[in-house]
Amino acid sequence: MKKGFLLVTFLLFSIVFYAQHYTKEKIEIPFKLSPNGHIMIKASVNGVPGNFVFDTGAGMNLLTKDFADKIDNLEKTTHFYTGHRATGEAITSDLYQSEVLKIANFSIEDEQFAVYDIDFPLDGLISLTPLQHKAFTVNFEENKLVIESEESLRRRKENIKFEMPLEINNDRNVKVSVGTIVQLDSLELHVGLDSGAGFDVYRFNSRFMEALGIDSTQVESKYIPSSFKPEQGNQYYFAEVSRLSDLKVNAEQIDFRATFIDGLIYEGIMGINWIGEIITFDIPAKRILVN
């Protein structure tokens, strides 16, 4: 009897817990794609409108200093964060708190931002932190970012082609990123999923080249300085790889060009377009649904 009561209580708690993470109505956010496949959205911070890259690999929200200087009541906190670019450079930034971040009809209060003095064509990056408890869909067919309701997510689940595991990296709710497990030829790797990388970008740590039968002395390579810290840089190698897929081989790339990088802090990091045209990141359930 007691076991049955505990089971019912657990199930009810789980239902309530997950339901709280979905919006009452789905919210559709139009986006534009750059020629390289970057997702560009409009958003406002404390009522100041701007243009941003939606970047699942950014980790944290970023405002350019020029844009931040336009915003009233952007509060500088006592906190800071030291993050690392994929190529290893440490970047330390003070943290600022907004009153409200609004993206179409979706708004969230007290969102944190890093502010960086950088020459950037847009006003900054919107990361996964505003959506860290949501399910959202990147629809490349209709150029829409959809924040799912419980009902719209249910309908997506009824029509999925396949599902993939979603790995989540959350550091104090300041830096949030996602990834999955892939098969790269004979190797099983944990990779970051980075919409900010653009289309058809596949980067791996150079330590895997030997296991893949790639001779670093026989492929194209060059040293590239950091755009953030020009005194630092990495050696890049460019080679053909025969196959990349998810573990169940539902999505795959065959005979593609990949980049191998000395000092990459991940096993791999890549764009998301290889997965499919309509990709749902269900963060509460730690899964990717592909329609």
Task: Give short role names for the model-derived ranges.
Residues 1-24:
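Bacterial Sec-dependent N-terminal signal peptides
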Residues 18-291:
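Pepsin/retropepsin-fold aspartyl endopeptidases
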